[in-house]
Amino acid sequence: MAASGNKIIIIAAPSGAGKTSIVKRLLDHMPDQLAFSVSCTTRSPRPGETNGVEYYFTTAEDFEKKIANGELAEWEMVYFGKYYGTPVSELERIWKLGKTPLLDIDVKGGLKVRNRFPDSSLALFIEPPSLEELSRRLHARGTETPESLDARLNKASYEMSFKTEFDRIVLNTDLDQACAETEQLIRNFLQA
């Protein structure tokens, strides 16, 4: 699927580690090189999210058709029976623009993409300073029930065990520093 020279940047992390904040900064700093790869999901939109911008929001039935038709580069059932996936059409759309897809993705999905495109991807794991800080960040969002917060923290602990399978680990204790480190890693990869 990836033609010679087509690269992919994977930013993965437990929920609340700061990957989306880092991705937004990267897109602001590198608009000529990177384009956001819009994933599809069966979860409901959060306040302020727009279909086709943050995600393509779809039904479970439609998502399962995409799986059956081979339309997804990767997919996972992530939280509480909600699907997330990367449409092949998104990667192709971005490559046609002459840019590199930037994936804001969960840990298992990130590893699937990395394993599917081992020679053309850079997989970065954004590590939170601690599970306590991660809990504070998730609670501050105001979108979690006590049950979903516990589930996300348990999943985060599990996901942290996969961090060494990524090309690089970026510790996000300070957002500006983490963004600068991530941007430099990407610039080096794209120039190689």
Map each language-model feature to its residues.
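NTP-dependent small-molecule kinase module
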Residues: A2, R136-E144, Y158-A192
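Post-Walker A alpha-helix
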Residues: I22-K24
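Conserved lysine of the Walker
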Residues: K19
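Hydrophobic anchor at the beta1->P-loop junction of P-loop NTPases
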Residues: I11
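Conserved phosphate-donor/acceptor-positioning beta-strand/loop module used by diverse small-molecule
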Residues: P101-D106, F117-A140
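Walker A (P-loop) phosphate-binding loop of P-loop NTPases
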Residues: G16
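Post-Walker A helix-loop "phosphate-sensing" segment adjacent to the P-loop in P-loop NTPases
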Residues: D28-F36
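ATP-dependent small-molecule kinase phosphotransfer cores
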Residues: S39-P101, K108-L111
